[in-house]
């Protein structure tokens, strides 16, 4: 059932000011997309600020750009933030420290659970984390005679790593939203991206194990051609995010690790979108060990896939505050900290809000929730439900979507992806979704869902049903 949205004069006035003066993400000021005012939120629902005498709620299937993993107005996170707010909101991390920062890093390292990753830099946002990671890799290589001339980054096409300059330089150079800046960015090295899979062979839903060794041919070629220039490899493990929402086979990541080992190249993993359970493992790179375990490879013969530099963000604070972190191994930390390094051992980066006490308090509690382990059952249930209700429906040709308007459908952990043949009309789609009580924000040819882990079975059923309904309406719309 659709609902009409209307506003009180006061709210309409605010929306008018917003339209004239506020720049929204990836939007034109001269012809901005419609926006919907939110007055409160709880669980998985946003409450719109309308003139209705009863609350108009929409289920947020996007987790506010993938970060609100524990849901809105979470009592535990609220309490942690409130307690800290009454003590102090922020203190310079240069020359000072505080219990919140120390406790957060202790628990973050427990969540990561990799003995080699022991050194943490707290940053502001996902893009800043990537900038820090690139800078760390460069400075680490400056400290070695054999590596000091390695200044290029190797990545794969269809990647997305953020909107700042260094991050843009490792985004897809042809099809990304940043391609217009190409001739103004540092020039890096791009290999062909791996093929998309419908789902992972590590999934409980029994996706077929399609691996083709040819997938790494171009990557190997780039290593052979440029090994003396490659400072580090950077990529999004297992699921490429805003560059196309492309899940790929764990074996590809294993092969990348082999090449990094062979050529002694640092490996940066950008888990800003995929980290903290989103793909079904606490971090996406851990699918590699699971895949090798499934194939009966003994631990002594397995390829240990683990980054030298790990970027995390989004779910770190579950959307309460902006925060990210970069975690590195001893190899990177000791090179940067060497008295013989160009800076005398200092890493020359220091955000104003580094280790913000409010952000640390809520991030620490977010880590507590993850350490309890409930996320695994939640994400597993979400994946199963998306598979049954959305994936299987769309894959059935009798339902008239696959091969007509839908090019492919994938499910990986708490992510459902529908790629269309035609580019979406965001205004048309958002109006349809909101009127039916669901928030899904499409981009390019993609409609996808990444709900909070706390979404109920009933809420997710509604999300899946509304998405299917709107896809059928889109089919009729474009065929008019």
Swiss-Prot record:
Descriptive protein name: Adenosylmethionine-8-amino-7-oxononanoate aminotransferase
Record key words, sorted: Aminotransferase, Biotin biosynthesis, Pyridoxal phosphate, S-adenosyl-L-methionine, Transferase
Database matches in InterPro entries: Aminotrans_3 (IPR005814), BioA (IPR005815), PyrdxlP-dep_Trfase (IPR015424), PyrdxlP-dep_Trfase_major (IPR015421), PyrdxlP-dep_Trfase_small (IPR015422)
E.C. numbers: 2.6.1.62
GO CC entries: mitochondrion
Similarity-based family: Belongs to the class-III pyridoxal-phosphate-dependent aminotransferase family. BioA subfamily.
Gene that this polypeptide is encoded by: BIO3
Annotated residues for binding of pyridoxal 5'-phosphate: 126-127, 270, 351-352
Record: residues binding substrate: 160, 350, 441
Pfam families linked to this entry: Aminotran_3
HAMAP family: BioA (MF_00834)
GO MF assignments: adenosylmethionine-8-amino-7-oxononanoate transaminase activity; dethiobiotin synthase activity; pyridoxal phosphate binding
Gene3D superfamilies, per the entry: Aspartate Aminotransferase, domain 1 (3.90.1150.10), Type I PLP-dependent aspartate aminotransferase-like (Major domain) (3.40.640.10)
Swiss-Prot/TrEMBL GO biological process terms: biotin biosynthetic process
Cofactor(s), names only, from the UniProt record: pyridoxal 5'-phosphate
